[in-house]
């Protein structure tokens, strides 16, 4: 089993920890907890770069090795890093588990060394009709991010 972790920090007290685990060539399971967010849906993505020199803005676009459009996690036409939304409770926190087969921890398209980002707004999953729907899901600003690193 390969494991990885990202510690998210950001503006306005938003923070969290996200764990990744993959058995062999199987799907990757992502479990995490976030706090300091406004209640509701927030876009959650793996971005292409693990560069946080300019905060979350330098993490680049969504991880998209196949050159597809933005979409929902269950869509065939989606960025590999499109993980949909997390639903934040009234207390500003969320605990979540996601399983995805497009974000491996090993191999050519490994997400290790890339960044995970939580956004200010909900991800419209590429279906909102906004000019940004097919690139970012119109998910708004980047509130917190962390670089995905291997874990013992």
UniProtKB/Swiss-Prot annotation:
Classification via SUPFAM superfamilies: Cu,Zn superoxide dismutase-like
Keywords: Antioxidant, Copper, Cytoplasm, Disulfide bond, Metal-binding, Oxidoreductase, Zinc
Keyword set includes Transcription: no
Signal peptide limits: none
Gene3D superfamilies membership: Superoxide dismutase, copper/zinc binding domain (2.60.40.200)
Known catalytic reactions: 2 superoxide + 2 H(+) = H2O2 + O2
Sequence positions that bind Zn(2+): 62, 70, 79, 82
Disulfide bonds: 56-145
Annotated GO CC locations: cytoplasm
Binding-site residues, Cu cation: 45, 47, 62, 119
Subcellular location: Cytoplasm
Keyword Cell cycle: no
Highest taxon of source: Eukaryota
GO MF assignments: copper ion binding; superoxide dismutase activity
CDD domains, alphabetized: Cu-Zn_Superoxide_Dismutase (cd00305)
Cofactor note: Binds 1 copper ion per subunit. Binds 1 zinc ion per subunit.
Enzymatic class: oxidoreductase
Principal location listed in the UniProt entry: cytoplasm
EC number: 1.15.1.1
Cofactor list: Cu cation; Zn(2+)
InterPro entries noted in UniProt: SOD-like_Cu/Zn_dom_sf (IPR036423), SOD_Cu/Zn_/chaperone (IPR024134), SOD_Cu/Zn_BS (IPR018152), SOD_Cu_Zn_dom (IPR001424)
Function statement: Destroys radicals which are normally produced within the cells and which are toxic to biological systems.
Subunit structure: Homodimer.
Family assignment from sequence similarity: Belongs to the Cu-Zn superoxide dismutase family.
Name of the featured protein: Superoxide dismutase [Cu-Zn]
Species annotation: Zantedeschia aethiopica
């Amino acid at each position: 089993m390969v494991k990885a972790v990202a510690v998210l920090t950001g503006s306005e007290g938003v923070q969290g920890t996200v764990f990744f685990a993959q058995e062999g060539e199987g799907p990757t399971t992502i479990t995490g907890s976030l706090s300091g967010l406004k209640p509701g849906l927030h876009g959650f993505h793996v971005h292409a770069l693990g560069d946080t020199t300019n905060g979350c803005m330098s993490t680049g676009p969504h991880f998209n090795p196949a050159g597809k459009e933005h979409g929902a996690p269950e869509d065939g036409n989606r960025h590999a890093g499109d993980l949909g939304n997390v639903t934040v409770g009234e207390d500003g926190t969320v605990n979540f588990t996601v399983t995805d087969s497009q974000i491996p921890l090993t191999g050519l398209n490994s997400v290790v060394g890339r960044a995970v980002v939580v956004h200010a707004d909900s991800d419209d999953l590429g279906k909102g009709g906004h000019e940004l729907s097919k690139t970012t899901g119109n998910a708004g600003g980047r509130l917190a991010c962390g670089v995905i690193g291997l874990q013992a």
